Each structure stands twice: as structure tokens, then as C-alpha cells.
Swiss-Prot record:
The protein's assembly and partners: Homodimer.
Pathway given in the UniProt record: Nucleotide-sugar biosynthesis; GDP-alpha-D-mannose biosynthesis; alpha-D-mannose 1-phosphate from D-fructose 6-phosphate: step 2/2
Catalytic activity: alpha-D-mannose 1-phosphate = D-mannose 6-phosphate
Name listed for the protein in its UniProt record: Phosphomannomutase 2
Molecular function as annotated in GO: metal ion binding; phosphomannomutase activity
Catalytic site positions: D12, D14
Gene: pmmB
Length: 249
């Protein structure tokens, strides 16, 4: 069967294709390969390219028609690089320094059960802020997620940063278990859509877990170009929906 080149299915990574920061399963890889014989497929993750590669595999840029890291600020088509955006050019070094200094002071004064390291991760198109620190263990990551749900550590921090830096033109997006992303307004996951021409792609599907307001899948899930979005809770949920929607006879 020939591939329908006018239809594409876009996938988030954590809690959609994989468990958070875990490797993709063979079952998921096989189903995606089967789906790719029907339509084009793409991945759009908030993480940087190397982190997505750790989860989806060394050869992942050849397993998808499109790969969008950092919301599409790093974009690949058919295994070839299309674009790399740069937050340094947008904000300038002085503003970046002011922002990071404020974040580090805030985290230093934050009273949470544990802290580890890498509270600010500088990426090409965004800053990733983690109150607990990105190099916490998987168990600590899961414990922080529960703590954050109750105590609203991330959402409170986002509110304070929005007020403090309202002139910077920044957008904030809570994703994953332990962090949130900061990037120029419009550089959310909808950014990737500019690489999918409207005259070429007529039907677009999106699968993601953080589709709620403030989540890093919200903007793309609700974008007018998305034909249908699917809110999922786990890779198992994604598998079930894919089988039911695309393969059920």
C-alpha cells in the first residue's frame, strides 16, 4: 500500500511514545513503522536532540519522516537538517544573564524536600528550568512530580517569572515531570507546523499527554491546522488508540 503523503501524525515523546526519559519499546517501534506505510509520521519533543535520541534510538531520524527537537526549533526532514533556531540571538546575552541569575536565586531560596543539580539547562531555542535539578534519579523524579502536583512548585515559579520578566516576550510551558520550558512567544510546539506546508499536508493528527492549558502540548493540540488531537496518558494508551484508529478493520 502506498503512503498517503497528505496526512501526517505527530507525536510527543514522554508519556506518549515512551515512559518519561525511558527508551522506546520494540512494540511501539514496530507499530510506528507499520503506520509509516500508511501516512507520514513525525516526532515533536520539547527536549534537545540528544535526549530524544537516547529515548527513540540512535537511528531515530530515519524512523520518522520529520523530527522536531526543542518544539521544532531544530528540524529534520527525511534525515536531513532543515533549521536550527537560536534563543541567544532573540534575547541577547545581557537578558539571558539577568533571567538565569534570577532563577538561580529563586531556586536557592526554594524550600523543597530535595535538590540535586542542573537547575537551568541552556538549549538552542529555549531554557529548561528544573526546581529539583535535572540530574535527579528516576525515583526522585517521580516523587517530585507527586509533590509538585500538591504544592504547585512549577506553576508558582512560572507565575513569578512571568511578572518579573513580562517585557522579555517569553512563553512558559510545563512539561514532563520535573521542569518547565521558557522560550520566545510563538516558539511552542506549533513552531514545527511552519515546516509542514498547508498545500502539502491536508490532514494532521497529534498525540500528546500535556494538552491541558499551560502544558507543553496545549498550543499544538488546539491549533486550527490539527485535524484531530489525542490526549494520551501513557505509551500503552497511544498503542491502543493507534491500533483502533488506523488499523481496525
Amino acid at each position: 500500500m502506498s503512503q498517503n503523503k497528505n496526512t501526517i501524525c505527530l507525536f510527543d515523546v514522554d508519556d506518549t511514545l515512551t515512559k518519561p526519559r525511558n527508551a522506546i519499546t520494540n512494540e511501539m517501534k514496530e507499530l510506528l513503522a507499520s503506520l509509516r506505510t500508511k501516512i507520514k509520521i513525525g516526532v515533536v519533543g520539547g527536549s534537545n536532540f540528544n535526549k530524544i535520541k537516547e529515548q527513540l534510538g540512535e537511528n531515530f531520524i530515519n524512523d520518522f519522516d520529520y523530527v522536531f527537537a526543542e518544539n521544532g526549533l531544530i528540524a529534520y526532514k527525511d534525515g536531513s537538517l532543515l533549521e536550527i533556531q537560536d534563543i541567544k540571538k532573540y534575547l541577547g546575552e545581557e537578558n539571558i544573564k539577568k533571567f538565569i541569575n534570577f532563577v538561580l536565586h529563586y531556586v536557592a531560596d526554594l524550600d523543597i524536600p530535595i535538590k540535586r543539580g542542573t537547575f537551568v539547562e541552556f538549549r538552542n531555542g529555549m531554557l529548561n528550568i528544573s526546581p529539583i535539578g535535572r540530574n535527579c534519579s528516576q525515583q526522585e523524579r517521580e516523587e517530585f512530580e507527586k509533590y509538585d502536583l500538591e504544592h504547585k512548585i512549577r506553576s508558582t515559579m512560572v507565575s513569578i517569572l512571568k511578572e518579573e520578566f513580562k517585557s522579555f516576550g517569553l512563553q512558559y510551558s510545563i512539561g514532563g515531570q520535573i521542569s518547565f520550558d521558557v522560550f520566545p512567544i510563538g516558539w511552542d510546539k506549533t513552531y514545527c507546523l511552519r515546516h509542514l506546508p498547508e498545500d502539502e499536508f491536508k490532514t494532521l493528527y497529534f498525540f500528546g499527554d500535556k494538552t491541558f492549558l499551560g502544558g507543553n502540548d496545549y498550543e499544538i493540540a488546539n491549533h486550527p491546522r490539527i485535524t484531530q488531537s489525542f490526549t494520551v496518558k501513557s505509551p500503552a494508551n497511544t498503542l491502543a488508540i493507534l491500533n483502533d484508529f488506523f488499523f481496525k478493520k
